[in-house]
């Protein structure tokens, strides 16, 4: 009844921790894969499990367009503020002042908060913990 999509990156091993059917997607493309799965299997609950480097950077276009189309899947956005699999570099979600391997004095510049931009007519629920 439930199908998950985990892309390359921090979430690539998610299938080892969840007792659901999972598939992998190219980096940033989990929303596109989830859209296709949901359209082929409208009776299934489909979700993506994505890190911030994947979702808020490489796959930003995919999630924005999926929301604009009103695709019917759930996204779990795991935000650790860095690119975790490649050495901890600064990501689009790195907080101002948060240190990373490429921002030793802390993150800088304006930060776009993804959760605050998730207010499309198709969005049902958005929570930030």
Whereabouts are the PLM-identified features?
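Short aromatic-enriched loop/helix-cap "lid" or pocket-rim segments at secondary-structure transitions
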Residues: 87-89
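Thiamine diphosphate
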Residues: 8-84
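General structural feature for long, well-ordered alpha-helical segments within catalytic domains
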Residues: 1, 59-62, 110, 114
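Conserved thiamine diphosphate
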Residues: 40-43, 91-129
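A short beta-strand-loop structural module common to alpha/beta enzyme folds
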Residues: 2-7
């Amino acid at each position: 009844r439930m199908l998950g999509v985990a892309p390359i990156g921090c979430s690539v091993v998610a299938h080892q921790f969840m007792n659901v059917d999972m598939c992998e997607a190219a980096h940033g493309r989990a929303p596109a894969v989830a859209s296709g799965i949901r359209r082929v299997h409208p009776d299934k609950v489909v979700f993506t499990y994505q890190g911030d480097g994947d979702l808020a950077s490489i796959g930003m276009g995919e999630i924005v367009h999926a929301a604009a189309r009103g695709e019917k899947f759930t996204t779990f956005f795991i935000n650790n503020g860095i690119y975790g699999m490649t050495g901890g570099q600064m990501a689009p979600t790195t907080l101002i002042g948060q240190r990373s391997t490429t921002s030793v004095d802390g993150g800088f510049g304006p930060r776009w908060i993804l959760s605050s931009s998730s207010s499309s007519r198709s969005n049902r629920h958005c929570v930030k913990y």
